[in-house]
């Protein structure tokens, strides 16, 4: 089990200790720093819904450093990002691959960021099947359906046409931050907090 840092804050009522993720949540920051599975997705969905209930008008900042993961788990987070009222600003630090890249692209338009040395990768969904031939066929058809769904989502958020997305995701397709900006996965490549805040302020005008 990874060690989770604790933050101690002083107040009029004395000291209060938070784990680092809870403290970030107070500032409307969600951090995905692992592969995506059902447990991780449920935590992120819960945080998104909580922050919406706290203030439906204030942006949520979603930092992503993820190699991807389970498609259905990632789709739960994606759908929640689109469902809630606040804009979700996304920031790639390290890498956003597979479902991580899709979530990065799904941020509010004009509020999708990459740090300069981040790596972004898109590809088609992975899957395996075993059992009777009819079961394998069902699983194969489902993977093909999910590939179409994911390609459609990437097309919607990047502005690339569906056929290009399908072609590019046929194999692992790696991009730098600048290349991801050109592709339409992010809107800005920023090296500092000041640059990010300036870009956000310009979007609000």
Swiss-Prot record:
Location in the cell: Cytoplasm
Highest taxon above the source species: Bacteria
InterPro entries: ClpP, ClpP/crotonase-like_dom_sf, ClpP/TepA, ClpP_His_AS, ClpP_Ser_AS
Reaction it catalyzes: Hydrolysis of proteins to small peptides in the presence of ATP and magnesium. alpha-casein is the usual test substrate. In the absence of ATP, only oligopeptides shorter than five residues are hydrolyzed (such as succinyl-Leu-Tyr-|-NHMec, and Leu-Tyr-Leu-|-Tyr-Trp, in which cleavage of the -Tyr-|-Leu- and -Tyr-|-Trp bonds also occurs)
One example of a Gene Ontology biological process annotation: protein quality control for misfolded or incompletely synthesized proteins
Disulfide feature: none
UniProtKB keywords: Cytoplasm, Hydrolase, Protease, Serine protease
Enzyme Commission number, as recorded: 3.4.21.92
Gene Ontology terms for molecular function: ATP-dependent peptidase activity; ATPase binding; serine-type endopeptidase activity
GO cellular component: cytoplasm; endopeptidase Clp complex
Active site (catalytic residues): 98, 123
Subunit structure: Fourteen ClpP subunits assemble into 2 heptameric rings which stack back to back to give a disk-like structure with a central cavity, resembling the structure of eukaryotic proteasomes.
Function, as annotated: Cleaves peptides in various proteins in a process that requires ATP hydrolysis. Has a chymotrypsin-like activity. Plays a major role in the degradation of misfolded proteins.
Family label: Belongs to the peptidase S14 family.
Protein name stated in the entry: ATP-dependent Clp protease proteolytic subunit
Lineage: Bacteria, Pseudomonadati, Thermodesulfobacteriota, Desulfobacteria, Desulfobacterales
Protein's gene: clpP
């Amino acid at each position: 089990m990874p060690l989770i840092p604790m933050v101690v804050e002083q107040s009029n009522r004395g000291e209060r200790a938070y784990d680092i993720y809870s403290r970030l949540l107070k500032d409307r920051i969600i951090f995905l720093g692992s592969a995506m599975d059902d447990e991780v997705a449920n935590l992120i969905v819960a945080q998104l819904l909580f922050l919406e209930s706290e203030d439906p008008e204030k942006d949520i900042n979603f930092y992503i450093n993820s190699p991807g993961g389970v498609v259905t788990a990632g789709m739960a987070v994606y759908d929640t990002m689109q469902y809630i009222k606040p804009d979700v600003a996304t920031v790639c630090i390290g890498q956003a691959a597979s479902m991580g890249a899709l979530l990065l692209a799904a941020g509010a338009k004009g509020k999708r960021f990459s740090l300069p040395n981040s790596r972004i990768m898109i590809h088609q969904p992975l899957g395996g099947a075993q059992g009777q031939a009819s079961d394998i066929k069902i699983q194969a058809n489902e993977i093909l359906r999910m590939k179409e769904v994911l390609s459609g989502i990437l097309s919607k958020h990047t502005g690339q046409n569906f056929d290009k997305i399908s072609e590019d995701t046929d194999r692992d397709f790696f991009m730098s931050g600048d290349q991801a900006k050109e592709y339409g996965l992010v809107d800005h490549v920023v090296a500092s907090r000041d640059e990010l805040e300036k870009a956000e302020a310009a979007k609000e005008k």
